[in-house]
Amino acid sequence: MAAAAASRGIGAKLGLREIRIHLCQRSPGSRGVRDFIEKRYVELKKANSDLPILIRECSDVQPKLWARYAFGQETNVPLNNFSADQVTRALENVLSGKA
């Protein structure tokens, strides 16, 4: 799981500085992201207490996972119509450097 991967320090080896999740409070395309946050955010944050994990809600925004690395490098993964499990896999890919 993403929390387990991050707790092993995988993201730290890549210079991961911050994770941001953008989503809409109401859109059907963000439903899986909302489910992910409700079910897995606490575990993820506990396993990564030193890593900023930011949740940004905005009306009509397309859901995305953003990762900021050392030297200001950023990557993003679109999460539109993803299930909570697909969001978890996307986060695992970011933490392992595959995204």
Swiss-Prot record:
InterPro entries named among the record's database cross-references: NADH_Ub_cplx-1_asu_su-2, Ribosomal_mL43/mS25/NADH_DH, Thioredoxin-like_sf
Family designation: Belongs to the complex I NDUFA2 subunit family.
Protein name in UniProt: NADH dehydrogenase [ubiquinone] 1 alpha subcomplex subunit 2
Quaternary structure and partners: Complex I is composed of 45 different subunits.
Encoding gene, per UniProt annotation: NDUFA2
PANTHER family (alphabetical): NADH DEHYDROGENASE [UBIQUINONE] 1 ALPHA SUBCOMPLEX SUBUNIT 2, NADH-UBIQUINONE OXIDOREDUCTASE B8 SUBUNIT
Gene3D superfamilies, alphabetized: Glutaredoxin (3.40.30.10)
Entry-annotated residues carrying N6-succinyllysine: 64
